[in-house]
């Protein structure tokens, strides 16, 4: 697997990233999704993409469960702009 620098963060990420938009909503069984996330390390992939907007944050929950025991091995990219609730601080990059 080829790796590249993630901007100026000092992190090295695989050039292939696992997208998790289908995880957490029943499209893919959570157990299977977790197995997929575990298996990518065997193929040299350390980069996982998710978002709070993917199925009301359920994708992030599945990713969290999957990486819990080996968190230091993964680089997780997420997005945090879309509304997650009705409150004034439930969207965007608020401090909350």
Regions found by a protein language model. Name each.
Residues 27, 86-96:
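Glycine/proline-rich, positively charged
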């Amino acid at each position: 697997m080829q790796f590249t620098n993630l901007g100026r963060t000092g992190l090295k990420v695989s050039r292939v990233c696992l997208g998790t938009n289908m995880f957490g909503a029943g499209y893919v069984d959570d157990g299977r999704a977790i197995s997929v996330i575990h298996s990518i390390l065997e193929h040299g992939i350390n980069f996982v993409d998710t978002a709070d907007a993917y199925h009301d944050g359920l994708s992030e929950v599945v990713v969290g469960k999957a990486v819990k025991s080996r968190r230091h091995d993964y680089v997780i990219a997420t997005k945090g702009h879309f509304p997650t609730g009705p409150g004034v601080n439930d969207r965007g990059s608020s401090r909350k």
